[in-house]
Amino acid sequence: MLNTGDTIAAIATAIVPEQGSIGIVRLSGSEAVAIARRLFHSPNRQKWQSHRLLYGYIRHPQSQAIIDEALLLLMLAPRSFTREDVVEFHCHGGIMPVQQVLQLCLENGARLAQAGEFSLRAFLNGRIDLTQAESVVDLVGARSPQAAQFALAGLQGKLAQPIRHLRATCLDILAEIEARIDFEEDLPPLDHAAVLHSIEQVFCQVNLILATAERGELLRSGLKVAIVGRPNVGKSSLLNAWSRSDRAIVTDLPGTTRDIVESQLVVAGIPVQVLDTAGIRSASDRVEQIGVERSRQTARSADLVLLTVSAESGWTQEDEEIYRSVSDRRLILVINKIDLANPETVIYPAEIKRVVKLSAAQNQGIEDLEKSLINAVQNQELQAANLDLAINQRQAAALTRAKIALQQVKKTIDQNLPFDFWSIDLRTAIQSLGEITGEEVTESVLDRIFSRFCIGK
């Protein structure tokens, strides 16, 4: 574990050469204000007050050379993110100003912060719990408005509150059980039915929250979608129509697309990486052969395959062969060019359940494609959850452990086993729920969580 008694410093804003207008250097710790007083000089002798901006210059303490014109923000403990004294130098952006100011801070008593160390201190000092800390990372890395919305909900405690309530319920049940173990003769008999009812209520709530795990994974990682098919079925036209751009070259010549063309979209709040692939066919051209092989590899690694065929030519033997090679993937059949031919004449395998008929050239049917895509990746359990939550993999794993433990408690009660057996599994559930908020967590878990943060957070 890091030494939390040190005063730490880091650049808190992204460094963008010649573009960033503002750069922030952040300090946190008992020496933060003292370091700031050595470096910052206000021409009008302004009073140093918490949560007030001061205007002035950052000077080298020995040479008195001006390093930058800046604003200083003090946030004195405990009214700061870390609940320590926090100082921010708001400098000019770019590379040199913030790096020079950071170096001065380090030369005057601060230590360079490690990844996530500001947020770690906020957690250790009780300012935030683990779910809120993880939500900070999610908010910074959000790739869609919906992802940002769920991250903000987590930051506001929307996950921590129900988890704490469930854990408190389990603790109350455990207290009743252990009281019967220690003072059985002095207390009335335990109502088994009431205990079982409470356990089942907790179990149902755990299941509801677990149902948001798939949503969370989609919002954080996004969806990789591969457009595959034989040449000249309109794959590149589909990419262009969907992305509302001319990312891919479109011609009537087979084999025009020879490499993977990518576009980033957001569909119903989910980040989607759309990959237009080379037409799959037997090719004599070496370059085209490489493109075809890349198409097959992309299809195998995609979360969802859009198998694209032409309404003009119908379902061909080539389409059948391509379908058989990707039939084990999550798949949508896209019948393109419906402006040129009747799509009802396309006879495709009956086992294909998700079919979208569109015209990429006429920009028809794109909304239907997006609806089908969302239906393909979101199961009914997720849609039914309807919670303002999107848990991550760590939280889902802990909830799964709690769920298994609660199942075992129910089984133990049904089998009328001694109270000692009830308490063992109930303690496991309590510990697993505590791991989510950080009430019960190991140092190695903390290291793993906060190592994902950028320096300065």
Curated annotation (Swiss-Prot):
Q: Give the record's keywords alphabetically.
A: Cytoplasm, GTP-binding, Hydrolase, Magnesium, Metal-binding, Nucleotide-binding, Potassium, tRNA processing
Q: Which Gene3D superfamilies match?
A: P-loop containing nucleotide triphosphate hydrolases, Probable tRNA modification gtpase trme, domain 1, tRNA modification GTPase MnmE domain 2
The enzyme's E.C. designation = 3.6.-.-
A Pfam family of the record is: MnmE_helical
Q: Which CDD domains match?
A: trmE, TrmE_N
Q: What does this protein do?
A: Exhibits a very high intrinsic GTPase hydrolysis rate. Involved in the addition of a carboxymethylaminomethyl (cmnm) group at the wobble position (U34) of certain tRNAs, forming tRNA-cmnm(5)s(2)U34.
Listed name of the protein: tRNA modification GTPase MnmE
